[in-house]
Swiss-Prot record:
Keyword list, A-Z: Electron transport, FAD, Flavoprotein, Membrane, Mitochondrion, Mitochondrion inner membrane, NADP, Oxidoreductase, Transit peptide, Transport
Pathway participation: Steroid metabolism; cholesterol metabolism
Binding-site residues for FAD, renumbered to this chain: A40, E61, L69, L105, W379, G386, V387, I388
Task of the protein: Required for synthesis of steroid hormones, for olfactory sensory behavior and completion of the second larval molt (a steroid mediated developmental transition) and pupariation.
Keyword NADP included in the entry's annotation: yes
Family matches, as Pfam families: NAD_binding_8
Organism of derivation: Drosophila melanogaster
Catalytic activity: 2 reduced [adrenodoxin] + NADP(+) + H(+) = 2 oxidized [adrenodoxin] + NADPH
Tissue: Expressed predominantly in prothoracic gland of the larval ring gland and nurse cells of the adult ovary. Low expression is all adult tissues examined.
Protein name in UniProt: NADPH:adrenodoxin oxidoreductase, mitochondrial
Topology in the lipid bilayer: Peripheral membrane protein
EC supergroup of this enzyme: oxidoreductase
Cofactor: FAD
GO MF entry, a single one: ferredoxin-NADP+ reductase activity
Length: 466
């Protein structure tokens, strides 16, 4: 990096014009485009910028605002998880990174165009669809996805009109992962605990009128296979005025298996057994009801029918027995999946992810031939598994692969590439995002919250000055 570049970086002149001067003055030969400004994209950018001196990284994001699931997926009462935004911000302010918000792959720009303009393209646009139960009546108004519910209270543009019906007593959540527990906690938490978070105002208003008293958390398998983690369960058990009720029969013989379990699973199971032993000592006006060994069978107005299952080699096999649960509102939380946004992407529609080997996107599935210069990271490549640390490690690995391919000349970077052409596009730069950030922070401060998110794309663009 040249002296001028270092001076600009040290002075902290992270405006778009300063960044452009740095990029032009050092005349880099390697241009890399990352599509998606979520955790996978930022972690990959962080490592690439560290390992490749002579490169420019452009991050293209379909929304005006960055951070993906950290902004729109992490529960509002988990602000400590959102601290990773500070790390992403440092990466975004690197003088060799440019942010292009409000640019959608497949609509505003094609993959072919990006490949023509960059030496390498890394797809990290995540998983924005949810898996279906595939049951009759699933399209009823009282059946919604946990993903949409999370987007609703987190202010994802387009989710503000979801209007979940919270006028009934009973809610059934199908699935037992951490997202399902987050949703249960949001439904059962005292409103005062949420007022100081960045929960959207319209969600707070709806929750203030909620009549929900009982939340069933239903899973196909048993306690030893529960997908939620100990942190999320502890939070549920500590909720004021909420009585957690386990079914004793679900834990038959479980205590005899404790010594065989790995430490994380053992600690989680011990906490469930402790809670089971103590249940009934504290009475609350609301109830959290985890139910195991039940598979969705049918949906009817006001209720849901489940098949009783039994475990056969860790798999849940339905029996002839059934159970019905009162369900004024049903939330499915059985996994996310990605979508194919451009015809140039080698997409596995069955698995809902991009065909790849260790982050290199395949050109030919049969032979395993990779498509040089085209990569994938995050949930788009792996499927929706793990937590942010999992995504970080995966993104670092793919970023290292990109660097290795460039350094070993497996990827040809000898030709000059122009980078993205933003002329005529309503692009939100990093400066524009900072204006949105300042606006949201000020609006939140006036209400005693960390921020009040803008939920309209047009309003975001207006505040950004686009």
């Amino acid at each position: 990096m040249g002296i001028n570049c270092l001076n600009i970086f040290r002075r902290g002149l992270h405006t778009s014009s300063a960044r452009l001067q740095v990029i032009q003055s050092t005349t880099p030969t390697k241009r890399i485009c990352i599509v998606g400004a979520g955790p996978a994209g930022f972690y990959a950018a962080q490592l690439i910028l560290k390992q490749l001196d002579n490169c420019v990284v452009d991050v293209v994001e379909k929304l005006p605002v960055p951070f993906g699931l950290v902004r729109f997926g992490v529960a509002p009462d988990h602000p400590e998880v959102k601290n990773v935004i500070n790390t992403f911000t440092k990466t975004a302010e690197h003088p060799r990174l440019r942010y292009f918000g409000n640019i959608s792959l497949g609509t505003d720009v094609s993959l072919r165009e990006l490949r023509d303009r960059y030496h390498a393209v890394l797809l990290t646009y995540g998983a924005d669809q949810d898996r279906q139960l595939e049951l009759e009546n699933e399209q009823l108004d009282n059946v919604i996805s946990a993903r949409k519910f999370v987007a609703w209270y987190n202010g994802l543009p387009g989710a503000e009109n979801l209007a979940p019906d919270l006028s009934g007593r009973d809610v059934t959540i199908v699935g037992q992962g951490n997202v399902a527990v987050d949703v249960a906690r949001m439904l059962l938490s005292p409103l005062d605990a949420l007022k100081t978070t960045d929960t959207t105002e319209y969600a707070l208003e709806a929750l203030s009128c909620s009549q929900v008293e009982r939340v069933h958390l239903v899973g196909r398998r048993g306690p030893l296979q529960a997908a939620f983690t100990i942190k999320e369960l502890r939070e549920m058990l500590k909720l004021p005025n909420v009585d957690t009720r386990w079914r004793t029969e679900d834990f038959s013989g479980i205590d005899m298996q404790l010594d065989k379990l790995q430490r994380p699973r053992k600690r989680l199971t011990e906490l469930m057994l402790k809670s089971l032993k103590e249940q009934g000592r504290i009475s609350g006006s609301k109830q959290f009801l985890p139910i195991f060994l039940r598979a969705p069978k049918a949906i009817a107005p006001g209720e849901m029918e489940f098949s009783v299952t039994e475990l056969q080699q860790e798999a849940a096999v339905p029996t002839s027995s059934t159970e019905r649960l009162p369900s004024h509102l049903i939330l499915r939380s059985i996994g996310y999946k990605s979508s194919c946004v451009d015809t140039g992407i080698n997409f596995d529609t069955r698995r809902g992810r991009v065909h790849n080997i260790n982050g290199r996107i395949l050109k030919d599935d049969a032979t395993g031939e990779v498509d040089p210069g085209l990569y994938v990271a995050g949930w788009l490549g792996t499927g929706p598994t793990g937590v942010i640390v999992t995504t970080m490690n995966g993104a670092f690995a793919v970023a290292k692969t990109i660097c290795d391919d460039i350094n070993t000349n497996a990827l040809d970077t000898s030709s000059v590439k122009p980078g993205y052409d933003a002329d005529g596009k309503r692009v939100v730069t990093w400066d524009g995002w900072q204006r949105i950030n300042d606006f949201e922070s000020a609006a939140g401060k006036a209400k005693g919250k960390p921020r009040e998110k803008i939920v309209s794309i047009e309003e975001m663009l207006r505040v950004a000055g686009v």
